[in-house]
């Protein structure tokens, strides 16, 4: 049987034992975080201030931007601070809070991508019924239900992981509180914990994956029937990057959850963790919004207004 200890804090592995690499890691993460911050705040401001963008699609894009800011803020700022100060500890309650919010925002990310794929399905496959199906009230209900469901899921998920205040070890073999690595430390009825965590995660991921694939299958089927080759190419160029990000997010997240937990920080674990924690918030503004002509036009109008107001 593993030795059990009552812990009050956890220790994280450093990104590198070399100070210069620690600074490089902090600088790179800071640039990524600032890019995500600026991009998403700009999208939120533009969609909020421009009346032309008060439609269901942009309502969900604004929710996704808010979510991306929250999602990346759970892990990256703390990681930057740890690298610069070389302080790798986090309190037990701090770890619980971070796991809770990470679970909530990760599940909400998946849920909102699913809702947005359904929105595109209705817009492309049933354009005449779009306004009747995607009403303002219906969109608000979907958004509120998504947020509440994901925070409830995170509460069950986190509560199940931290049922007892004892662990096998206080050292997390990752440079942030990655859920699989934390799960490997908790000691309470390990098999039951892992089984329930896997069951909850599998139901969420599989359900969202099936719904997204159905939506995109219908979208591509409709697009292939479009007579104009230029319109087909435009539709494919819009949907393909979205699918790539979704598949990266799902596959790396599942691999991290189902794969073996390494005894030390490895390059493979690092790449996988970065792919599903940093990459989606970084790419989503580019793929879903900044490549969008209406968003770029609205940004231009906003910049023009600001320019003339200052004169």
Swiss-Prot record:
- Kindly list the residue ranges recorded as spanning the membrane: 27-47, 56-76, 93-113, 142-162, 190-210, 242-262, 270-290
The disulfide bonds in this chain are 95-188
Q: Where are the glycosylation sites?
A: 3
Entry-linked SUPFAM superfamilies: Family A G protein-coupled receptor-like
List the ranges whose topology is Extracellular.
Answer: 1-26, 77-92, 163-189, 263-269
Question: Where does this chain mainly localize?
Answer: membrane
| Keywords of this entry | Cell membrane, Disulfide bond, G-protein coupled receptor, Glycoprotein, Membrane, Olfaction, Receptor, Sensory transduction, Transducer, Transmembrane, Transmembrane helix
Single annotated GO MF: olfactory receptor activity
* Signal peptide stretch: none
The compartments listed are: Cell membrane
Q: What does this protein do?
A: Odorant receptor.
Q: What is this protein called?
A: Olfactory receptor 14I1
Source organism (scientific name): Homo sapiens (Human)
Gene that encodes it: OR14I1
């Amino acid at each position: 049987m593993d030795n059990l200890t009552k812990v009050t804090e956890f220790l994280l592995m450093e990104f590198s034992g070399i100070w210069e690499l620690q600074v490089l890691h902090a600088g790179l993460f800071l640039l990524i975080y600032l890019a995500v911050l600026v991009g998403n705040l700009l999208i939120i401001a533009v969609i909020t201030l421009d009346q032309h963008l008060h439609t269901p699609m942009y309502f969900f894009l604004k929710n996704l931007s808010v979510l991306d800011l929250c999602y990346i803020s759970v892990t990256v700022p703390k990681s930057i601070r740890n690298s610069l100060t070389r302080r790798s500890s986090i309190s037990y309650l701090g770890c619980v809070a971070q796991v809770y919010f990470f679970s909530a925002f990760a599940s909400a990310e998946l849920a909102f991508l699913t809702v947005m794929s359904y929105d595109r399905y209705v817009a492309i496959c049933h354009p005449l019924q779009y306004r009747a199906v995607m009403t303002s009230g219906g969109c608000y209900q979907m958004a509120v239900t998504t947020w509440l469901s994901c925070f409830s899921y995170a509460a069950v998920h986190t509560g199940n992981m931290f049922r007892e205040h004892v662990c096998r070890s206080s050292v997390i073999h990752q440079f942030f509180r990655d859920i699989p690595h934390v799960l490997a430390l908790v000691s309470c009825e390990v098999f039951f914990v892992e089984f329930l965590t896997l069951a909850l995660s599998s139901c969420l991921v599989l359900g969202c994956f099936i719904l997204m694939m159905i939506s995109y299958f219908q979208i591509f089927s409709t697009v292939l029937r479009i007579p104009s080759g230029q319109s087909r190419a435009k539709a494919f160029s819009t949907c393909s990057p979205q699918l790539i990000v979704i598949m990266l997010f799902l596959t790396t997240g599942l691999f991290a959850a189902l794969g073996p937990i390494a005894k030390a920080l490895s390059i493979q674990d690092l790449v996988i963790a970065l792919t599903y924690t940093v990459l989606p918030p970084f790419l989503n503004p580019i793929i879903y919004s900044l490549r969008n002509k209406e968003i770029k036009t609205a940004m231009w109008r906003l910049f023009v207004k600001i320019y003339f107001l200052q004169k």
